């Protein structure tokens, strides 16, 4: 009987801890959306990229702005350096060790570069979709 109670309480504590983590992460995501929704909407009007897609990718790539890359380099989309990139650089392990990522002065600059990045020919088919077709964009 005592061991069953111990198992039950352990399980209950685990569930409460998990619930708190999910709630905390949800709060972080809501804060991220509140902070950057106007930026994403502006980019949508300028570049025809759905704001929901921009926000979703920023949330996933940056952990709602909490990742080391977002905090140290204002890079919310995991955009890496290219051969022609002349700006500041931030290095961290990713797919490979010590990869080079772009550094931005502000998060908003990162959002703009994300829009410009999606204008590359590789993503041209996305722009054939309606801006309201978020499933197609995803």
PLM features per residue range, with description:
Residues 1-24:
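Bacterial Sec-dependent N-terminal signal peptides
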């Amino acid at each position: 009987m005592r061991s069953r109670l111990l198992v039950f309480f352990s399980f209950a504590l685990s569930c409460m801890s998990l619930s708190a983590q999910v709630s905390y992460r949800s709060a972080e995501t809501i804060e991220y959306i509140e902070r950057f929704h106007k930026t994403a909407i502006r980019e949508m009007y300028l570049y025809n990229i759905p704001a929901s897609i921009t926000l979703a990718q920023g949330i996933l790539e940056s952990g709602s702005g909490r990742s080391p890359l977002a905090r140290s380099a204002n890079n919310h989309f995991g955009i890496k350096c290219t051969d022609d990139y002349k700006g500041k650089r931030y290095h961290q392990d990713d797919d490979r060790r010590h990869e080079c990522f772009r550094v931005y002065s502000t998060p908003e600059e990162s959002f703009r570069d994300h829009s410009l990045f999606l204008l590359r020919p590789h993503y041209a088919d996305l722009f054939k979709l309606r801006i309201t077709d978020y499933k197609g964009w995803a």
